[in-house]
Amino acid sequence: LVALYNDSTGVNLNTSFISQDTLFPSYSVPADLHLFPATFYEDMDHDGIKDLIVSPNSSSESADKESIWFYKNFGGNNSPQFYLQNKNFLQENTIELGRESKPLIVDINNDQILDLLVSNFGEFDLSIPIHYNSYIESYENVGTNENPIFKKISSDFQNISSQINDINLVPTLG
């Protein structure tokens, strides 16, 4: 993310950029998203001061997890000072597997309580040739069928991703 600063003396049509921060905000943790970051200047914590949200603005080739970066503004609306608070704002208390997630409700441990399997198209990863790694996560229902409470059991149910090594896995039963 690049911040461009203009001089404060010119009229909008005649103003020029006088400095830039190519690792914005360089005084904190720079907002370094792989492709086409979108920024939002909104009061996210209801303290009356606008904060900064940075997230991917692309439907592909971008991170699926930790993809909503929340920077709290410790300055003011006219002189913001943004400091990273977390990289998974609004995602931290959810089951987040990224794009094209596919859930399947099934009793995986034969306790008569329905559990959860969730797959995805693939998690974005620049280090692998096709840039995506698909897997199935499993969640045991430690509550009841009427009031489910899901506890994550495995990030790769039955080690399927290493056996199949493909994208767009879909959990099914027959």
What are these model-predicted stretches?
Residues 23-40, 91-104, 156-172:
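Repeat-based blade/solenoid architectures
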Residues 12-24, 80-89, 148-158:
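Beta-propeller fold detector
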Residues 1, 46-56, 110-120:
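Acidic/hydrophobic-patterned starts of short beta strands in beta-sheet-rich repeat architectures
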Residues 58-61, 122-126:
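Short glycine/acidic-enriched loop and turn motifs that connect beta-strands
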Residues 64-68, 131-135:
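A detector of repeated loop/turn-to-beta-strand junctions in beta-rich toroidal repeat architectures
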Residues 41-47, 105-111, 173-174:
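Acidic, divalent-cation-chelating loop motifs in proteins
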Residues 5-15, 74-80, 140-148:
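Short loop/turn segments immediately following beta-strands, especially the blade-tip
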